[in-house]
């Protein structure tokens, strides 16, 4: 690949160099007389700042590389074919996610990216390096992750969140964002849940924020769609605005959460498929929990909610299943409401297609 160098420019700057082009809104891409070391110095993490010279097919996936593999590489003839000026291999060996240079702070969205990497390589024991945590904190102190209409757009932030949601340990991304004090900059509504108590009888984990991440973890274990995982993450936002005098109870938190979900979706420019499911799960999840006690009229209203397209109702029910089991000690609890409502939904679809609505009532 051609070595390149990205530098911060003034907003909307149009470079004169014919070999340059604008990147995002305030980056300029240079390709003239750029060395490979200069190129690598602009990469976000040291583990991504390794290049191989022509002659070595270096394609080992990070998650499959053991310390023994790296030691062999260090002691083999192939080491001479690697360009590793920032000790990326050493950081792989030490399981460290470390920024390559101060250039990391020129694109604050990298904060989300490194937490996404922490989620991806969580099972391999990777952690964010302390010096990188310090750099991130200095960036946040300068409010550099504030979402705006220039470089830090809602779309760019959500793109990283979307990628993070697809990881097997998606909850780790948000734990890391919370630990870095970065979550409040991108999703303050979610951050506000931490420290808010719930009734221990139903929520042994007590903390509303912890519960939300447990629900996301369950959604990942159930291999639910990204849209469903996003809905799982936001389903209890209303608990963050409960009157403190009413705690630990949260009567009406479903309705209270809907405008908060809408705020998140608007700020991050979330696609309709995500916002639609997140809104309905937030508003109606208690109805699914009480499915066996609902009357025909309420059930019909749920099934006939025209906001849900195709088979999104099934995703809705499955997120509620994740909610019921995303609680301390209840991870393997049965949830018959899911089978009950999915069977009703299938009957509903059949009755509507055959124009026999009474079959559902029966």
Give the label of every model feature segment:
Residues 1-362:
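Catalytic cores of the polymerase beta-like nucleotidyltransferase superfamily
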């Amino acid at each position: 690949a051609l070595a390149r160098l990205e530098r911060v420019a003034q907003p909307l700057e149009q470079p004169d160099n014919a070999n340059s082009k604008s990147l995002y809104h305030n980056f300029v891409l240079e390709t003239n007389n750029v060395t490979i070391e200069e190129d690598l110095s602009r990469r976000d993490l040291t583990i991504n700042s390794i290049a191989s010279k022509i002659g070595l097919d270096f394609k080992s996936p990070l998650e499959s590389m053991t310390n023994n593999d790296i030691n062999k590489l260090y002691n083999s003839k192939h080491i001479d074919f690697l360009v590793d000026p920032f000790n990326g291999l050493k950081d792989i060996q030490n399981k460290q996610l470390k920024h390559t240079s101060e250039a990391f702070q020129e694109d604050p969205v990298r904060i989300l990216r490194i937490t996404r990497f922490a989620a991806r390589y969580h099972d391999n024991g990777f952690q964010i390096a302390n010096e990188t945590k310090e750099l991130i904190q200095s960036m946040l102190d300068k409010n550099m992750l504030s979402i705006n209409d220039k470089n830090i757009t809602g779309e760019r932030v959500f793109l990283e969140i979307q990628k993070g949601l697809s990881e097997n340990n998606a909850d780790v991304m948000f734990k890391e964002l919370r630990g870095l004090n970065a979550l409040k900059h991108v999703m303050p509504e979610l951050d506000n849940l931490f420290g808010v108590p719930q009734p221990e009888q139903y929520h042994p984990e007590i903390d509303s924020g912890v519960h939300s991440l447990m629900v996301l973890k369950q959604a990942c274990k159930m291999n639910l769609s990204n849209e469903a995982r996003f809905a799982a993450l936001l389903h209890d936002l209303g608990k963050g605005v409960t009157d403190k005098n009413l705690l630990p109870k949260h009567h009406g938190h479903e309705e209270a959460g809907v405008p908060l979900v809408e705020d998140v979706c608007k700020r991050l420019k979330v696609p309709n498929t995500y916002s639609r499911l997140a809104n309905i799960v937030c508003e109606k999840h208690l109805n699914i929990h009480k499915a066996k006690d609902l009357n025909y009229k309420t059930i019909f209203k749920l099934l006939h909610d025209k906001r849900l397209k195709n088979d999104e109702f099934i995703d809705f029910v499955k997120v509620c299943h994740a909610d019921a089991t995303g609680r301390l000690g209840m991870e393997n609890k049965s949830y018959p409401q899911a089978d009950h409502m999915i069977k009703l939904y299938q009957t509903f679809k059949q009755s509507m297609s055959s124009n026999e609505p009474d079959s559902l009532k029966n």
